[in-house]
UniProtKB/Swiss-Prot annotation:
ATP binds at G159, V160, T161, N162, S163, G164, K165, T166. Residues 527-553, 826-875 are annotated as: Disordered. Residues 559-804 form a coiled coil. Residues 63-506 form the Kinesin motor domain. It comes from the Eukaryota. Keywords: Acetylation, ATP-binding, Coiled coil, Cytoplasm, Cytoskeleton, Golgi apparatus, Microtubule, Motor protein, Nucleotide-binding, Phosphoprotein, Protein transport, Transport. The lineage of its organism: Eukaryota, Metazoa, Chordata, Craniata, Vertebrata. Mitotic kinesin required for chromosome passenger complex (CPC)-mediated cytokinesis. Following phosphorylation by PLK1, involved in recruitment of PLK1 to the central spindle. Interacts with guanosine triphosphate (GTP)-bound forms of RAB6A and RAB6B. May act as a motor required for the retrograde RAB6 regulated transport of Golgi membranes and associated vesicles along microtubules. Has a microtubule plus end-directed motility. The modification N-acetylserine is found at S2. This is Kinesin-like protein KIF20A. SMART domains: KISc.
Length: 887
């Protein structure tokens, strides 16, 4: 027994035609299957017309169609007050969902999360009043026409459980769904053009296999056993038909999501007469049959399988004594297209056989009673119709088109099924539907962002693996969303609407064509001689493209021709590598040049910005330095002016002090002579005390001078402040000169005092001596006052120098420390205020003229002894202020 496996011809499914077919729209991709040598010259092709290719190109930008259908309320649902207006149709394309009370969406909205009203757009919305025939004419009719023309279509229903998905797909005996109506339209359109014998059978994803007479009889016996097995079960169930008639009615009235009234397990007892009536009814639809080419014959094959708990089961499996069903494997062909291994494909001749086989598959499908549906589909069922387009009477390579209708199991929250087998089923159903949503979201993102392509998780679920071909180039897809308008299922309905919103954004885009030359073109180009058989084939197919069969079967070519092809391919590969290397070098050079240019531009921008910032900072600091210079100049000019005034005043006082001793000395000599005998002992003691006081003043003066030199070294200003300190140093030198002059005068007074003492020893004038001592005391007090004023002046100069040094140092290091100058001035001002006498008001700042009185105060007459005056001068507070603190 020999099997002959064929792939579609070049004019239909070759690499060159992939460009004309969009993603989700094109027919099955070619397979490099082995073609028998004796069939190569007899193969004929059915090439797509130019108009069909143009139509395909026009549809490349079309979005995926998503239809919405709302089922009506049941009487029991109206009794439970499920109609709360949560599902509203705004127009034929817009649906508004309003969250009812006690729904999770409304509670989230009250907490500030989410929205209470959602609006969705669909290709078309069908209300509860739309019947099955109208729904089919508006949705499925054009898709069936495309399938008869050679395209592949996938239609899948999505929605929560008990939303009417199975009713939309299969319907009832009186109101057929889209699947029976599609079968009726297909067979009505193919009347008189069906292939008489099933000698070609679909295989893998898009291949066919030739069957001999024995294999044809086996296929017929398999179909007959399925049909007879179904009829025997119907005859056995006739005896209990009356007993379950009431239960079937209840089940039909409470369920919209299972095969009701003739398709569910509760209504499997429809008689053969009813089947005949149903098939006759579907065989005569109101729609006009689709016109197909008259020179083409068609062969219709169907398959029916389910995905239950991530396991694949054939629903058209012949009856056997085994209680455990055999699981199927999901495999890939050599081109990566998925297919179900060992899946039964049954040849059908009319709609009645297809309906009976559908009924047999429904009996084998997994149903169960759930919280929301008494007869709920617990698996994803996929009913596929493959049509082989045959031309000619001999051996042919057919074109294959496929129509797949998938009844997805309803999504349901696990809170309704908390344990047992139903919980496991619900988990697997929700997982597969979630994976389908992820795949659709990834496809949408890849279409919107061409530069960054994400991996599409088709392999995470068996359902998405089956759908992969329709989503990636082998056909087109359509989604039918079924909505349950009950308020209790609003949250699930909202999730289904959001899921469909992703699918509605997918766009049919053409796949990438690599443009790789075929093996036949290599041989024609590089072979010097062509065989006679190939010459005939080239003449017959001169207007067609290279078929994949020529590439698949290399036995028709000679060894030398194949070696030449290998050498040509090596040369072509080397050329391509050189071109790609040159392109890579060029791209790298361009990228490097662009990067260098960008770096230069950035460097230039940074340098310009730094220059601008530098100029701004220089202007800012120059302005600040200018302001500071003006303020310092004004301040020190005022200080110098006030200091000059004080020095002039001190000089005036010094001149007065010099003149007074000279005037009083002449009169004091006579007094000294008269009183020297009376006050000899007292004057000697007072002189010693005055001498000791003078020595103490000298010691303090020397220590003050040393301390002044020390502070001058410490407070030596930086070079920028040198012009300001020169004037101050000059004034300080003048003050020191005045101090030296005062010392000289003090020495002269001491000498005069000694001479007066010697004179007192020889004179007896006590009154004159007392008067002379009084004058000396006055002179000493004035000198002490003058010395104290000079010392205070020196302290002020030190303080001013400290201010200047601190200010200039802060300016020299950073301009930001200028604010600290004000606080330093405040602290220094506070120290000066602490030196003020207690009787001065706080609002005035004492200056040099306020520190010491200009004229000596009058002494009290009660305490006028020389000893008391000396004690007062020693305990004067004016002498404590400059030396009592350490600056």
């Amino acid at each position: 027994m020999s099997h002959r496996i064929l792939s579609p011809p070049a004019g239909l499914l070759s690499d060159e035609d992939v460009v004309d077919s969009p993603i989700l729209e094109s027919t099955a991709a070619d397979l490099r299957s082995v073609v028998r040598k004796d069939l190569l010259s007899d193969c004929s092709v059915i090439s797509a017309s130019l108009e069909d290719k143009q139509a395909l190109l026009e549809d490349t930008s079309e979005k995926v169609k998503v239809y919405l259908r709302i089922r009506p309320f049941l009487t029991s649902e109206l009794d439970r007050q499920e109609d709360q207006g949560c599902v509203c149709i705004e127009n034929t394309e817009t649906l508004v969902l309003q969250a009812p009370k006690d729904s999770f969406a409304l509670k989230s909205n009250e907490r500030g999360v989410g929205q209470a009203t959602h609006k969705f757009t669909f290709s078309q919305i069908f209300g509860p009043e739309v019947g099955q025939v109208a729904f089919f004419n508006l949705t499925m009719k054009e898709m069936v026409k495309d399938v008869l023309k050679g395209q592949n279509w996938l239609i899948y229903t999505y929605g929560v459980t008990n939303s009417g998905k199975t009713y939309t797909i299969q319907g009832t005996s009186k109101d057929a769904g889209i699947l029976p109506q599609s079968l009726a339209l297909i067979f009505n359109s193919l009347q008189g053009q069906l292939h008489p014998t099933p000698d070609l059978k679909p295989l893998l994803s898009n291949e066919v296999i030739w069957l001999d007479s024995k294999q044809i009889r086996q296929e017929e016996m398999k179909k007959l056993s399925l049909l007879i097995g179904g009829l025997q079960e119907e005859e056995l169930s006739t005896s209990v038909k009356k007993r379950v008639h009431t239960e079937s009615r209840i089940g039909a009235s409470n369920s919209f999501d299972s095969g009701v009234a003739g398709l569910s397990s509760t209504s499997q007892f429809t008689s053969s007469s009813q089947l005949d009536e149903t098939s006759q009814l579907w065989a005569q639809p109101d729609t006009v049959p689709v016109s197909v080419p008259a020179d083409i014959r068609f062969s219709v094959w169907i398959s029916f399988f389910e995905i239950y708990n991530e396991l694949l089961y054939d629903l058209l499996e012949p009856p056997s004594h085994q209680h455990k069903r055999q699981t199927l494997r999901l495999c890939e062909d050599q081109n990566g297209n998925p297919y179900v291994k060992d899946l039964n494909w049954i040849h059908v001749r009319d709609v009645e056989e297809a309906w009976k086989l559908l009924k047999v598959g429904r009996k084998n499908q997994s149903f169960a009673s759930t919280h929301m549906n008494q007869q709920s589909s617990r698996s994803h069922s996929i009913f596929s119709i493959r049509i082989l387009h045959l031309q000619g009477e001999g051996d042919i390579v057919p074109k294959i088109s496929e129509l797949s209708l998938c009844d997805l199991a309803g999504s349901e929250r696990c809170k309704h099924q908390k344990s047992g087998e139903r919980l496991k089923e619900a988990g697997n159903i929700n997982t597969s539907l979630h994976t389908l949503g992820r795949c659709i979201a990834a496809l949408r993102q890849n279409q919107q962002n061409r530069s960054k392509q994400n991996l599409i998780p088709f392999r995470d679920s068996k359902l998405t693996r089956v759908f992969q071909g329709f989503f990636t180039g082998r056909g087109r897809s359509c989604m039918i969303v079924n909505v349950n308008p009950c308020a209790s299922t609003y949250d699930e309905t909202l999730h289904a609407a959001k899921f469909s919103a992703l699918a509605s954004q997918l766009v049919h885009a053409p796949p990438v064509h690599l443009g790789i030359p075929s093996l036949h073109s290599f041989i024609k180009k590089h072979s010097p001689q062509v065989g006679p058989g190939l010459e005939k084939e080239d003449k017959a197919d001169s207007d067609l493209e290279d078929s994949p069969e020529d590439e698949a079967d290399v036995s028709v070519y000679g060894k030398e021709e194949l070696l030449q092809v290998v050498e040509a391919m090596k040369a072509l590969l080397l050329k391509e590598r050189q071109e790609k290397l040159q392109l890579e070098i060029q791209l790298r050079e361009e990228i490097c040049n662009e990067m260098v240019e960008q770096m230069q531009q950035r460097e230039q921008w940074c340098s310009e910005r730094l220059d601008n910032q530098k100029e701004l900072m220089e202007e800012l600091y120059e302005e600040k330095l200018k302001i500071l210079k003006e303020s310092l100049t004004t301040f020190y000019q005022e200080q110098i002016q006030e200091r000059d005034e004080k020095i002039e005043e001190l000089e005036t006082l010094l001149q007065e002090a010099k003149q007074q001793p000279a005037a009083q000395q002449s009169g004091g000599l006579s007094l000294l002579r008269r009183s020297q005998r009376l006050a000899a002992s007292a004057s000697t003691q007072q002189f010693q005390e005055v001498k000791a006081e003078l020595e103490q003043c000298k010691t303090e003066l020397s220590s003050t001078t040393a301390e002044l030199h020390k502070y001058q070294q410490v407070l030596k200003p930086p070079p920028p402040a040198k012009p300001f300190t020169i004037d101050v140093d000059k004034k300080l030198e003048e003050g020191q000169k005045n101090i030296r002059l005062l010392r000289t005068e003090l020495q002269k007074l001491g000498q005069s005092l000694q001479s007066a003492e010697r004179a007192c020893c020889h004179s007896t004038g006590a009154g004159k001596l007392r008067q002379a001592l009084t004058n000396c005391d006055d002179i000493l007090i004035k000198q002490n006052q003058t010395l104290a004023e000079l010392q205070n002046n020196m302290v002020l100069v030190k303080l001013d120098l400290q201010k200047k040094a601190a200010c200039i140092a802060e300016q020299y290091h950073t301009v930001l420390k200028l604010q600290g100058q004000a606080s330093a001035k405040k602290r220094l001002g506070a120290n000066q205020e602490n030196q003020q006498p207690n009787h001065q008001p706080p609002g005035k700042k004492p200056f040099l003229r306020n520190l010491l009185p200009r004229t000596p105060t009058c002494q009290s007459s009660t305490d006028s002894s020389p000893y008391a005056r000396i004690l007062r001068s020693r305990h004067s507070p004016l002498l404590k202020s400059p030396f009592g603190k350490k600056y």
